[in-house]
Amino acid sequence: MKKTTLGMALAIMSAMPSMAQQNGLTDTGKSKYAVLTSTPINAVKWTDGFWGERFGVFSGTSVQSMWETWQSDKSHGFHNFLVAAGEKRGRRHGPPFHDGDMYKWLEAVASVYAINKDPELEKIMNRFIGCIVKSQREDGYIHTPVIVAELNKRLAELEKSTGKEATQEEIDNTVVGTKVGTAKDGAFGNSLNFETYNLGHLITAGLVHKRATGQTTLYNCAVKAADFLCSFYENNAEALARNAVCPSHYMAIAEMYRETGNPRYLKTAQGMIDIRGMVENGTDDNQDRVPFREQYNAIGHSVRANYLYAGVADLYLESGEEQLMKNLTSIWNDIVTRKMYITGACGALYDGTSPDGTDYKPDNVQKVHQSYGRPYQLPHSTAHNETCANIGNMLFNWRMFSATGEAKYVDIVENCFYNSILPGISLDGKRYFYTNPMRMSDDLPYKLRWPKERTEYISCFCCPPNTLRTLCQAQDYAYSVGNKELYINMYGANTLSTKIDGVGDIEIKQETDYPWDGKIKLTITRLKGKKELTFKMRVPEWAKKAVATTGDGRIKVETDDRGSYMTITNEWKKGDVINIDIPMEARLIEANPLVEESRGQVAVQRGPVIYCLESNDLNGIDIDNIAIPLDAKFTTVETTIDGSRMMALETEAINRAEKPWTGTLYREVGTEKNKVKIRLIPYYAWGNRGKSEMTVWIPAGL
């Protein structure tokens, strides 16, 4: 029975602000139930090292390469906006979610511009933004499949009545519908048109663009889009509930509330979660079979799920509703202890049946796709692990961290960045994965849906721009600000320039070779006078111990409390230093024995980085014949792949020297074996040396 009423959905009080606004990526500075807020969107700049090198590729190659893709006949992405804007005649091409994908790319460009102020990037943004402005209806609705179809219909009617081709002036004066809230006007007629997904990413792009540039042209479009969603919700909530597919709009509306303080947005954010219980014939695949407050496990399509959880976490940060936190905490525990890959990736199944939405009656079985499976159902070769789902997992954990300040959430944020988001893009910044399996084999007896190699473009192009915008924003997750507290979350060589209440303007220089080395040096390069401030330095879950020492040696903190923050409170001045040491050593990881595909196997991790074995490094040895001794000793070896510096691991392994398995299902265990030296590379770097076989999990040998 559906328990939620529309009246309940509309009833909410707006939260009072609690902290100073920081103008960050997720600006929780005034969120009543946030304990932390982000630094400003231009506050952190990678200087060198791992993230400096990666950001150089993303900003110098990737954003431009993707712009070329959007302008090409492969994607037709920009073509669709040119037609919708009346700058070009033609039909619309491509999937309906390409609008949102272009908005994600635009957000990536804005995030890079916030750092480097490249005028060429500003020109690119302005070119696209101009088309968005022309394409958007007066009521704020914009969806190029609908806009183009209606524009072409009206122009055809005009040309039929006049007997001649429409002039540019007539095209410019052809205004598409402006009514709100009815399917006949083209809005939300089909849930698989991804309109809320598109509008959500437009709103987010508008907010990021404003914070990055100070300009309001795109932001004004975002406000109109947000107002359209509010109006549609207020007039036709049930139709909107049916259209919450890959619901980026939950996070977007919450962030618009933070930007404006307008209680209408908070009321809509609350209501959009409440009305999920109004959906008739809801599905586990879309997480709407039962109201959200009755959900305690991660189910269904993993992108839709993780975006939902992140959006609900945003709502909690503003409303403080305890029931929402109960749901989110239970779901988080289900993901992390039973359904998440070692890389932070989510979504084990390409296709399957829901283990939740049925009493095992054949006529009630529900299909799921790209989804969470049963607890501990974590296959290797057929792992879907869509990059968008992994990004959603990161976004969910970041918001949980903002609400609690607990390091366990940042552990997963970091894990996702290194091990399930970075693998989605090639080292040269031009090619992308859609899925992220734990194993890749040449001779699978079935065909997987997505390419085995990264490609520049596939028609389902949601992951590449999402990957790019997230990686272009990695610096925004490096620090958080509390009450006279500075949290150091993700280590990397950078500079920070921000303002902390009660402290004033402060600048920090961070020097490190992380993630290859656990030594980090923090130097205060700007601070007026002496100020009391608490530095909170993350001790990752993988670290056996960590030490922090002030430059003068007066204060030393040492801990073996994994997954925590070391704390030093002191009166600081310009020039003061903190040295952090987090020893790194390679370690073997095993899975819970209920993860059947990983039984008897180990994975290798050093620091935050998960490693893999790739056939390129085996000199013709069958990857299936390699086993790693449980007492293996690893040596770090600096290497480069496609110009990118990294640390490989070498060790002595076992080659079982078995015959091929062709035509064989079972056989007697062989005893022939010999020792062989192997090299493992970071998982994010696999597939950058041509087509290859790869595995994260390797049999344990004696």
What does each model-found stretch correspond to?
Residues 1-23:
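Bacterial Sec-dependent N-terminal signal peptides
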Residues 21-101, 126-177:
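Low-complexity, Ser/Thr/Pro/Gly-enriched N-terminal "stalk/linker" regions
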Residues 23, 34, 85-102, 118, ...:
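Solvent-exposed loop and edge beta-strand segments that line ligand/cofactor-binding
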Residues 23, 328, 411-526, 561, ...:
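C-terminal beta-rich recognition modules with glycine/proline-rich loops and embedded aromatic residues
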Residues 49-53, 57, 104-119, 200-215, ...:
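Well-ordered alpha-helical scaffold segments within catalytic/enzyme domains
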Residues 54-89, 124-141, 220-237, 268-286, ...:
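Long, well-ordered core segments of solenoidal/helical folds
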Residues 171-259:
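A conserved hydrophobic secondary-structure block that centers on an alpha-helix together
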Residues 543-569, 588-594:
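Solvent-exposed beta-strand/loop surfaces of large extracellular or lumenal domains
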